[in-house]
C-alpha cells in the first residue's frame, strides 16, 4: 500500500460512518477500530459478557466491511482494516485470541497481500511484567502467522 491516511474509531456505527466519510476520496486509508475487551471493562463499564463483547466487535467489523466496500465503489478509496482489542494487556489471553479470530472471520479477507487484517495489540497500562505481554503477543502470532499483520503497540 502506498502512503495514505489512518483513522481511528470506536466500535460505534455513527462514528464509523463519520470516520469513513472523512477519508472518502483519498487513494488509501487504514481504518482502525477498537473496543475494550478486558474483564473490568466488560463487566463494570459496559456490563457485557464475553459473548456480547465478541458480538459487538463482529457486528461493527461487518459494518466497516460494508461501508468501506461502498466507499471504494463510489470514490475508489482502498482500505485496510486494523482492529485493536483495547485493553489487550489486561484481557485474558484465550479471550484475546477468540475475539481476534471472530473479527478476522467477520472481515473475511485473509491470506497473503494487502487485504490481510492488522491486529494492533496495545499495552497502555503496565500492570504485569514485560514477558507477560510478550507471551500474549506470541499467542496471537502463532494463530495468525500467515493471514494477519500483528503490530504490538507498547505505549
Describe the role of every protein-language-model region.
Residues 1, 13-151:
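Alpha/beta enzyme core
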Residues 2-9:
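A glycine-rich helix N-cap at a beta->alpha junction
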Residues 153-155:
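Conserved mixed alpha/beta core segments that line enzyme active sites in large multi-domain catalysts
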Amino acid at each position: 500500500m502506498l502512503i495514505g491516511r489512518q483513522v481511528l474509531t470506536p466500535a460505534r456505527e455513527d462514528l464509523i460512518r463519520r470516520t469513513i466519510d472523512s477519508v472518502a476520496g483519498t487513494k488509501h486509508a487504514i481504518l482502525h477500530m477498537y473496543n475494550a475487551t478486558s474483564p473490568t471493562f466488560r463487566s463494570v463499564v459496559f456490563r457485557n459478557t464475553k459473548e456480547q463483547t465478541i458480538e459487538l466487535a463482529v457486528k461493527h467489523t461487518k459494518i466497516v466491511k460494508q461501508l468501506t466496500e461502498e466507499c471504494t465503489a463510489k470514490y475508489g478509496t482502498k482500505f485496510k482494516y486494523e482492529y485493536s482489542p483495547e485493553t489487550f494487556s489486561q484481557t485474558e489471553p484465550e479471550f484475546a485470541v477468540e475475539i481476534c479470530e471472530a473479527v478476522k472471520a467477520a472481515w473475511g479477507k485473509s491470506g497473503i497481500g494487502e487485504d490481510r487484517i492488522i491486529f494492533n495489540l496495545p499495552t497502555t497500562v503496565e500492570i504485569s511484567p514485560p514477558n507477560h505481554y510478550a507471551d500474549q503477543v506470541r499467542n496471537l502470532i502463532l494463530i495468525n502467522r500467515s493471514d494477519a499483520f500483528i503490530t504490538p503497540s507498547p505505549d
